[in-house]
Amino acid sequence: MKPQLWDSAAGSALPFWSAEQLQEAWESRHDLKEVADGCRLNVLSAIQHAGSGHIGTSFSSMDIFIAVRKFLQGDRFLTGDSLEQIFFSSKGHDAPALYASLHSGGELSDAQLFSLRRLGGLPGHPETVTPGVVTNTGSLGMGISKAKGFAKAQRLRDPSSRQPVVVLLGDGELNEGQVWESMPGAVKEGLGEVIAIVDSNGIQSDTWTHHTLPMGDVVARASAVGWHAVECAGNDPDEVLSALEEARGDSRPSFIVARTTKGSGISWMEAFPENGAYYQFHSGALAVPLYDQAASELINRFGGGSPNEGVTSAEPVLVLDPYSPKARPTSMVSIWENMLVDVMEKNPLVVALDGDLSYDTGTHIAREKFPDRYIQSGIAEQDMVSMAGTLALSGFIPLVHSFATFLTMRATEQIFNNASEESRVIYLGFLAGLIPSAAGFSHQAVTDVGIMSSIPGMRVFEPSGAEEFHWCIEQAISHPGPSYIRVGAVAPVVSGREGIHRVNRVIEGGATALVSSGPLLTQQAIESCTVLENRGFPVPAVYSVPEITNPFEAWEIDELRQYERVIVLENHNSARAKHFQLSSQLASNDLNIHRLGLDGLPANGQPAEVLEHHHLDAQSIAEAVARLAGEGFLPTAKIESDSETYTHRESH
């Protein structure tokens, strides 16, 4: 049987198995493992087409998805019937595996499968806009609580209902306290229909779970609070199916620890030494030679072929180093990873805390150089923040690292408590703002400015480049109270400026000033000047403002008074930032102040299409400048002013 081919944007054809081919294979051999391997090829190609996604955990959990589908559908397995019972993945990283399982049953089309991480397509983490997805996930720890709610709702509608509610968790997710908070209540309520499966592949974002945050005997812990708790071989779908059937026959809620291998299905993805520091296949599309090798192995295995038939070597065609991080282009994170080392060398009171994101937040170099002043907290943001609070009370300067959305929303109460002690804790929130957008809104921090600016004494920063980053960390260390630094995931704006202030002019301009914070919108503002110049329009001035929340000083107000209008660009949805401050401080003046920013939930997709969707790309900013100046030229941007909101769209 030959796979189908999907044309990628790069011009290459990506192999995949259609739902009909998967159904044909099942009807011929009734081999769940074969169906799972067929879905692995679809996961691999969908991620390759998207350019990003989580391969390792999708491969480790693929057998579980297929086993659960068989458990819930029985004889209707892969018949195209909708999955009526409730099953969802709490960890969310395995969304490609979820989509592949839905596609295998005909619930998602081929085109939908290859719309992964595109605007209007399949979200990077599960959302209810997708057929077959019953709840939004991606923020860890909520799964069992959500499953309890579904089970209780079923009973309220039909007191005799005991339809299984199955939730898949990650073993790293077990770091989150909510998982363990949720378990006793399921026993108290007698919710025997709740079945939790743990994809226990042993590896978190960078390395082994027992090196990150050892969780002990989780089977014994679940059993101790009254759950039916068992283990099984998670990459054997028949064993998983047997464990599910055993759970169905037990009156207690069930906790199944499925022992899996991260990257299961590809020999060299499975190989990771005990002392390995960086698992190479946690996220991201593969280099083309690796993709071709992995696809060949999966294609030849499907239909009863030899696992390595047609594959020249069981070793990867490219050398992969499990002891070194992946190379990455210059970014705000790469700037910080060296700056953090410098800060810790100069100040022995600085302590770095990390939430299982040492590579993604740039703490990995400091971890090796200063192991005594590096604390790996795992995926336990509330614990990390409270620990930082008492470190600060004891005279140290804790620097708390996590993704901005998890840090600021999960640990808000702990952050507030620390602030009430007027202690100096510095929070660094990564992936801040609209971009990266492919992972979906669970990972896009657009509420963080509103949250952190409401904390008493909190200073909020967002540097646009290396010079401003140095200024921000100096300001934060000298500030006696708490500080929050948003760290964008895009390339820094290179300015070459030596003197950094709270308001920095990047480009000289005419009657309009664009004011922004951070690299994303500062760069779009700079590029909008090129768009305007190429069209013969006056170029606006561009200002970068690295501190978001403090009111403007008198000289800064005077600086902006020279312009006829000011447009504030905001990479968040807070009403408490620069547009609000300017509107308040200049209310008695005739200065026209406008805002281009976010409202509501951010869109999911590739960066360029998401920026355009929110009218925050260079073209939209240029059109807003021209429109407000009365110059016309096909306006499409949504512009907020003090008095009203204008929505301009191109007409034909």
Regions inferred by a protein language model and the residue ranges of each:
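Thiamine diphosphate
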Residues: M1-V166, F302-P482, R486, A491-P492, ...
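Short active-site segment of divalent metal-dependent hydrolases/proteases
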Residues: L174
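Residue(s) in the substrate-gating loop at a strand-loop-helix junction
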Residues: D171
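Structural beta-sheet core signal
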Residues: V167-L168, A196-V198, A352-D354, V400, ...
